Swiss-Prot record:
Residues 134-162 are annotated as: Disordered. This is ATP-dependent protease ATPase subunit HslU. Belongs to the ClpX chaperone family. HslU subfamily. PANTHER family: ATP-DEPENDENT CLP PROTEASE ATP-BINDING SUBUNIT CLPX-LIKE, MITOCHONDRIAL-RELATED, ATP-DEPENDENT PROTEASE ATPASE SUBUNIT HSLU. GO terms for cellular component: HslUV protease complex. Its main location: cytoplasm. InterPro entries: AAA+_ATPase, ATP-dep_Clp_protease_ClpX, ATPase_AAA_core, Clp_ATPase_C, HslU, P-loop_NTPase. The gene is hslU. CDD domains: RecA-like_HslU (cd19498). A double ring-shaped homohexamer of HslV is capped on each side by a ring-shaped HslU homohexamer. The assembly of the HslU/HslV complex is dependent on binding of ATP.
Amino acid sequence: MSAMTPREIVHELDQHIIGQAKAKKAVAIALRNRWRRMQLSDDLRNEVTPKNILMIGPTGVGKTEIARRLAKLANAPFIKVEATKFTEIGYVGKEVETIIRDLVDVAIKMTREQQTKKFKHRAEEAAEERILDALLPPAKDQYGESQRDDSSSTRQTFRKKLREGQLDDKEIEIDLAQAQPNVEIMAPPGMEDMTNQLQSMFQNMGGDKRTKRKLKIKEAFKLLSEEEAAKLVNPEELKEQAIFAVEQNGIVFIDEIDKICKRGDSSGPDVSREGVQRDLLPLIEGCTVSTKHGMVKTDHMLFIASGAFQMAKPSDMIPELQGRLPIRVELEALTADDFKRILTEPHASLTEQQRELLKTEQVTIEFSDDAIERIAKAAWQVNEKTENIGARRLHTVMEKLMEEISYDASEQAGTSLVVDAAYVEKHLGALVEDEDLSRYIL
C-alpha cells in the first residue's frame, strides 16, 4: 500500500496529466484515506468505509489516464473494467462478480512477485548449487547418495567464474519441472465454482513431471532461480495475503458507467443497463463474493466510476447507485492552451516521443514554439467543428503532420529538421479549414 501524501500523489499525476486539479485532488485524498484507515485500531477500522468517487467529464480529458497512473502509484490490487462488458445475471455475458475474481487474480500475481523478490537471494543460491552440480557432478557414497563437497577448490573456482559471468555461454543439461498445461473450460454464468474445480483437477492430473533441457548457463540460472523461488513460496500464505490486500486496499475503476444509464426518454427492459446497475449495488455496498481462492468481502474496497455523460445524466443512474458514489468530480473540457501544454509538459510528451523515435534513424527534429501553438490550435479547432474527442485529437493531428517526415526518415540519416508554423500550415492548414476533410481525415 502506497504511503504517499495527497500532495505527492497530485505531483506525480501532474507529470502525466495536464489540468484536472479537482479530480487529481479527489483521487489523492481517497488513496491517502486508504493508508490512514490501515493505521486505525481493528474495531474502528471496520467502521470506516471508503467514499466512492464518480468522475464526470467529456471524452479525452484524462479520466482513464488518471486511473492508469493511479494503478501504478497505489501499490495495491487495482483493476479497470468497462461497465459495457457486463450483463444482468441470468443473461449471456460477463457477470459483475467476475470483477472481484479478476481483482483477486491480480492480487495473487502481485503478492507472488513480492514473495519471489523476498526469497530472491535464497533462490539464487540454490540455483547456483544446482548449476555447479551439473558442471561438477558430486561423487556418490556406498548407498548411492550424492556427496557434495562445497569446500573443494575446483568447486570454488567454478563458483567464482559463474558469479563473474565467465560461464554464461557454456551449455549444460538441467532437470526442470514441466510446465502444467493451462486448461480453459467454458461454463454458463453462475457455474464458476465447478469450472475452477475441473480446471484444478485437470492440472493436478499431470503430477510433478520433470524434463531434461540443454540450455546456456545464463538462461538456466534464470529458470532455476524461478523454480527455487516458487518452492519457497507458501501457497496458503500467498492466498491469505492476497485476499487481505484485496479486501483492505483493493481499488476498482469502472469506466463508461454512463453507457449503462437508462435515458429518460427510453422505455422497456434493457439487459445491459439497469440490470447491471442493480448487480453493481451489492458489490459497491459490500457483499461476499466466492472466488477460486476463497471468499472475498467487498465492504472496504474503493470504487471509482467514470463516464462522459453526453447522452445521459448522472441523475439517470438508479438512485441507490447514485447514493453509493457520494464524491462527484467534474473534469473540464480541454482548451487550446491545455493542448499546448499537453504537447510539451508531461513526461514522455507527444513531441518528445516523436523526437526519440526519429533519433533511432539518426534524424534530429525540433518543434518551434509557434509550431506547437499552431498544432494545439488545429486540434482544438477540429474538436470544435466536429466531435470533441479531447486530447486524443492531438494523436491524430500529430500523426498526420509527421507522416511525410516518418516515411522519409530512414533515407535522411544525419540530418536535422525544424518543424515551424509554416510547415504545420502547409500540411494541416487545408485539412483544418475544410470541415468535410477534417471530419474524415482528422
